[in-house]
Design a protein with these regions (language model features):
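Conserved acidic
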Residues: 1, 50-53
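Conserved long alpha-helical elements within nucleotide-processing catalytic cores of c-di-GMP signaling
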Residues: 12-45, 52-78, 89-93, 97, ...
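Catalytic core regions of nucleotide second-messenger enzymes
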Residues: 85-92, 116-132
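A structural signal for short, well-ordered beta-strand segments
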Residues: 46, 96, 129-133
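Catalytic/regulatory signature loops of cyclic-dinucleotide turnover enzymes
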Residues: 122-128, 145-183
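Short beta-strand-to-loop capping motifs
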Residues: 98-103, 135-138
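Short, low-complexity N-terminal regulatory "tails/caps" that precede and couple sensory modules
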Residues: 1-20, 163
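Alpha-helical scaffold within the catalytic cores of cyclic-nucleotide enzymes
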Residues: 74-78, 106-124
Length: 185
């Protein structure tokens, strides 16, 4: 195992097989940068995977079941990464990322696979997977971390459905919300 891979774990992460194998933030950002550099000219997207109501799930059923759910998502993403060769990563908490083609059909299929993987963990609390997608070619000059941030912003956008595509107007809305909050303080 390389030194980079050995250092990708952190104290806050639960110790489990898939969560130990999936790239952590720094390793994922490097892998994403390398992948996108090697595959220029192809339409790619960065996706942020968010487990809605995860904190509530953890509080109601305990961290052991929460960790098992995270393990399931990591395992599912590792399977996709192994099958396709596209990078996948885990930034801690319930924040997962992956690179995939900028094709809605592929993104919808990945989302459906994630939802199916998580179905066994469902209890009385409704939770689901939301995926925010940031198209790489629509954001020229954005580095790997910025692409992940944009995907994450898209993932928390309210609206119908479970697949949200990043639009630059989302940044303006976020800035306006932060300004309003600042004025309230």
């Amino acid at each position: 195992m390389s030194e980079e891979r050995k250092t990708k774990t952190d104290a806050a992460a639960p110790a489990s097989a898939a969560l130990q194998r999936i790239d952590r933030k720094d390793a994922f950002l490097q892998a994403l940068h390398t992948f996108l550099t090697a595959h220029q000219g192809t339409e790619w997207a960065v996706a942020a995977v968010d487990i809605q109501h995860f904190k509530l799930y953890n509080e109601l059923y305990g961290t052991e079941k929460g960790d098992a759910l995270l393990e399931t998502v990591a395992n599912c993403l590792l399977g996709y990464s192994k099958q396709t060769g596209y990078p996948a990563g885990y930034f801690g908490n319930d924040d997962f990322f992956l690179c995939l083609p900028d094709e809605k059909a592929e993104q919808t299929a990945v989302l459906a696979t994630l939802q199916a993987c998580m179905a066994a963990g469902r209890q009385d609390v409704t939770f689901f997977v939301v995926m925010g997608v940031c198209p790489v070619q629509a954001n020229p000059g954005a580095d790997a971390a910025t692409l992940c941030n944009y995907a994450q912003i898209a993932g928390v956008t309210t609206g119908s459905g479970y697949l949200h595509r990043f639009e630059p107007t989302m940044l303006n809305e976020l800035k306006e919300q932060q300004q309003l909050l600042g004025e309230l303080e």
